Amino acid sequence: MAKVNLIESPYSLLQLKGIGPKKIEVLQQLNIHTVEDLVLYLPTRYEDNTVIDLNQAEDQSNVTIEGQVYTAPVVAFFGRNKSKLTVHLMVNNIAVKCIFFNQPYLKKKIELNQTITVKGKWNRVKQEITGNRVFFNSQGTQTQENADVQLEPVYRIKEGIKQKQIRDQIRQALNDVTIHEWLTDELREKYKLETLDFTLNTLHHPKSKEDLLRARRTYAFTELFLFELRMQWLNRLEKSSDEAIEIDYDLDQVKSFIDRLPFELTEAQKSSVNEIFRDLKAPIRMHRLLQGDVGSGKTVVAAICMYALKTAGYQSALMVPTEILAEQHAESLMALFGDSMNVALLTGSVKGKKRKILLEQLENGTIDCLIGTHALIQDDVIFHNVGLVITDEQHRFGVNQRQLLREKGAMTNVLFMTATPIPRTLAISVFGEMDVSSIKQLPKGRKPIITTWAKHEQYDKVLMQMTSELKKGRQAYVICPLIESSEHLEDVQNVVALYESLQQYYGVSRVGLLHGKLSADEKDEVMQKFSNHEIDVLVSTTVVEVGVNVPNATFMMIYDADRFGLSTLHQLRGRVGRSDQQSYCVLIASPKTETGIERMTIMTQTTDGFELSERDLEMRGPGDFFGVKQSGLPDFLVANLVEDYRMLEVARDEAAELIQSGVFFENTYQHLRHFVEENLLHRSFD
């Protein structure tokens, strides 16, 4: 089948007026290869040139005024090739002096009694405007040439093309293309949406703010609807090929294992276990996300599920992003299982004869549970009969890596875990095809971490507070954003310098250093020393963000904390507060921006990771929350997953109804179905 386009053009880009081979090269750099691409190349923002009442204008603000010329323009030259043009306008009975620097050619264009529109900076005291643009209009109404002066689209461009050129070329294209509707009449009427023809023309050349809002609303819904059609269709395909054997676990053995645990499960943990167990009994493969705040006990839930698989005669696999985390999981699971399960660890460090023996035991079924890094997805890693694959911090792996691990078993159930609570907005889009379990309770006995914010000049006081904790026999983390000093970030502390400073303060043997440039063995050695309390203070970059578990650590200092996002700060903070002892987190920062100040304030107000994740998403946007590449998020042109969340829910419901009812596969939707299938369905956002 040929590629289906919903925007069809009778000619190519080269046939547009003003586009030659050189312009084609520039357009291609902007990812514009066809006339359809050009029409869908939307503005990034709009210059608001709406004429305002000068009585309402703020001093030193950028304004647009319209008035009648009542003095002839005068040009004064000074310096080398510099000029100043002065002209006076009458604007609603207010005499305004207009100044234009280095635009002497305007003298020939500005005439007495002419009505012109000027955009520039307003000086209320002097009653003058320093103009940067002028629009000519002798009739007192906007000419066709300046019809879009009120709301002027601004595009992302590169050297070799100007704003006016791309606006003109898009206008040309819109005049001649055939635009097929993406939404049905029924949907448009139901939600009071515009036609795609009106929407695209308005987004490129808005006649009013009201029209622009209507067009933006329609295009945002269209983007979300097409995305959800893709998600729902993939979900249907996934489930149609997702036959699975029912995991016939021994419930009595599982209950006995839970009773032997040295602690009582929280209600949230029990609920999550029950949800997962229902999935394991179902005739289709499980796709579930288990999300919980730092220290909420996700690993225990995973352990119970692994044990259930063992009682049914199946193996389990747990893939984590780092060797340190893999080793910690292996250690904690071995302690939980004792002799009841054979747990093995496979990382890049396991080599030679040891690796060969491990792989043999895995293939013959001797190993019940395999824990490791991406080493688990290598071709020679063959399971006997894996029934459950668990991926921890799954957004840190690419889709391909997760798929390769899943394919280790023909009918494998999949559980994703994350300690980064995912805002419901992202959960519905990134993980739309999954069921979600959430653990929002902390284990009994845990005390909330006390978080404070200190400026750099208060560092000595923070050091005294940390010393007080160390004297109690506790341990501490000190986090820095950089490994070494940077000439570009001279005001940012680096981990090596702070490590050396703290060595002088506490003594060489009491302070350890951890960062990404160390080898795996070096990292393991440092972490082992910290875990064994051979060192008191661990100075580190964010490599300790995920999974590191040292219950005796009760103090964390995060230097230049404003350099991190809320989710990262919360993950770092979660390295303390892992026992019944009171823990502290001190943010050292002197933020220069409102956003930085807001982040520090929020961190001191709440320890709820779910609330923080929502705030982080609002502040940073979905693309930065995980990074578009990792998250699988499409790069929407108009829609915003935060602002348009309600619209996303509606789009999802409408798409689900179309797909699940089968109506989408009838002739009525043939054109749209072919478009989604050819352009979106198998497109990867990795």
Curated annotation (Swiss-Prot):
Transmembrane segments: none
Stated name of the protein: ATP-dependent DNA helicase RecG
Single Gene Ontology BP annotation: DNA recombination
Enzyme class of the recorded protein, top EC level: isomerase
Catalyses which reaction(s): Couples ATP hydrolysis with the unwinding of duplex DNA by translocating in the 3'-5' direction; ATP + H2O = ADP + phosphate + H(+)
Gene Ontology terms for molecular function: ATP binding; ATP hydrolysis activity; DNA binding; DNA helicase activity
InterPro entries in UniProt: ATP-dep_DNA_helicase_RecG, DEAD/DEAH_box_helicase_dom, Helicase_ATP-bd, Helicase_C-like, NA-bd_OB-fold, P-loop_NTPase, RecG/Mfd, RecG_dom3_C
Family in the record: Belongs to the helicase family. RecG subfamily.
Species lineage: Bacteria, Bacillati, Bacillota, Bacilli, Bacillales
Keyword Glycoprotein tagged: no
EC number: 5.6.2.4
Gene for this chain: recG
Xref: Pfam families: DEAD, Helicase_C, RecG_dom3_C, RecG_wedge
Coiled-coil residue windows: none
Residue span(s) of domain Helicase C-terminal: 462-618
Region forming the signal peptide: none
